[in-house]
């Protein structure tokens, strides 16, 4: 299995962690990446959604993340993906707590029934054996009740190779504090590598999570959207001041890469949410964000980004 203890990993985040962003984070020091959520039913009905599943060799090791409510469908969709794309892992998402997903009794909803989670993993592991692709899982502490040890044991018994634990319940979403000590307790019953996740906001938090939980890897989520340099900071053990010009260069490079798997107009529309994120914490950025994201077309958007680079001193 392709995993090294001590890895720092970019978490999957819907609408953000597509191929371009993943590549840039790998260049900045992320050790591993995951795709956004891909519906098993969608794959079986309509084929693989390439905007979500597209990746380059630079992004490896990569986990293609699948969700659903039916073990057989998840296993079948995983085989379709394995045959066509040959990822390093198929990841089964049991952690997403978005209401729409929960209403479909998928992902985080399944935390209510650990034996069913085990069945999903077991069927998928068996289905993927001919392709030599292992199965990982992304979980939370539980649905409403914290029963993470039981969940870990069920998944191990079913043949999972790697587990990422977000240290909140599905009901909590992102509210309250992530209970890092529960990752440590889950690690005690684990025979597979455990990746810790939740409330990792700086490179020092990455260091602290390794120390406090004894986890094998740390997953960085929302903090990487505003500071993708967090991976480089951890590797170099220092804070890195990133100016407006460098932030806007990041956006322009991401935008250029996005056109490999979507139209330029679509890329320009989608990059706006990342612009808002990457300007977080930049002094006097409120009016700059508004100015850039209200560009009416691609040409105007790029022009405004270039203007922002030239005006860096005004925002320093």
UniProtKB/Swiss-Prot annotation:
Q: Where is the signal peptide?
A: none
Q: Which UniProt keywords apply?
A: Flavoprotein, FMN, NADP, Oxidoreductase, RNA-binding, tRNA processing, tRNA-binding
**Superkingdom of origin:** Bacteria
> What catalytic activity is recorded?
a 5,6-dihydrouridine in tRNA + NAD(+) = a uridine in tRNA + NADH + H(+); a 5,6-dihydrouridine in tRNA + NADP(+) = a uridine in tRNA + NADPH + H(+)
Q: What is its EC number?
A: 1.3.1.-
| Entry cofactors | FMN
Q: Name one Pfam family in it.
A: Dus
Q: Which residues cross the membrane?
A: none
Indicate the enzyme's highest-level EC class. oxidoreductase
As for what it does, the entry says: Catalyzes the synthesis of 5,6-dihydrouridine (D), a modified base found in the D-loop of most tRNAs, via the reduction of the C5-C6 double bond in target uridines.
The text of the family note is: Belongs to the Dus family.
What is the protein's given name?
Answer: Probable tRNA-dihydrouridine synthase
What organism does the UniProt record list as the source? Aquifex aeolicus (strain VF5)
């Amino acid at each position: 299995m392709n995993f090294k203890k001590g890895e720092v990993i970019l978490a999957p985040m819907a609408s953000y962690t597509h191929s371009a962003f993943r590549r840039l984070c790998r260049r900045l020091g992320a050790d591993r990446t995951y795709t956004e959520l891909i519906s098993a039913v969608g794959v079986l009905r309509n084929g693989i959604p390439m905007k979500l599943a597209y990746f380059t060799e630079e992004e490896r090791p990569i986990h293609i993340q699948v969700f659903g409510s039916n073990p057989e469908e998840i296993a079948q969709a995983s085989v379709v993906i394995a045959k066509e794309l040959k990822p390093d892992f198929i990841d089964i998402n049991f952690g997403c707590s978005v209401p729409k997903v929960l209403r479909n009794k998928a992902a985080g909803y399944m935390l209510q029934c650990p034996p069913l989670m085990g069945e999903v993993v077991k069927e998928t592991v068996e289905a993927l054996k001919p392709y030599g692709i292992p199965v990982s899982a992304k979980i939370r502490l539980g649905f409403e009740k914290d029963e993470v040890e039981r969940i870990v044991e069920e998944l191990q018994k079913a043949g999972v190779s790697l587990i990422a634990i977000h240290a909140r319940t599905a009901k909590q979403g992102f509210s309250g504090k992530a209970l890092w000590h529960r990752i440590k307790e889950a690690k005690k019953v684990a025979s597979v590598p455990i990746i810790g996740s939740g409330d990792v906001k700086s490179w020092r938090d990455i260091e602290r999570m390794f120390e406090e939980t004894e986890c094998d890897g740390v997953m960085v989520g929302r903090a990487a959207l505003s500071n993708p340099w967090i991976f480089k900071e951890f590797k170099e053990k220092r804070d890195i001041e990133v100016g407006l010009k460098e932030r806007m260069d990041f956006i322009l490079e991401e935008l250029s890469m996005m056109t490999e798997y979507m139209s330029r107009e679509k890329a320009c529309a989608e990059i706006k949410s990342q612009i808002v994120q990457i300007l977080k914490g930049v002094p006097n950025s409120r009016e700059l964000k508004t100015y850039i994201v209200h560009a009416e077309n691609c040409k105007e958007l790029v022009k405004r980004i270039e203007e922002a680079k030239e005006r860096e001193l005004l925002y320093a």
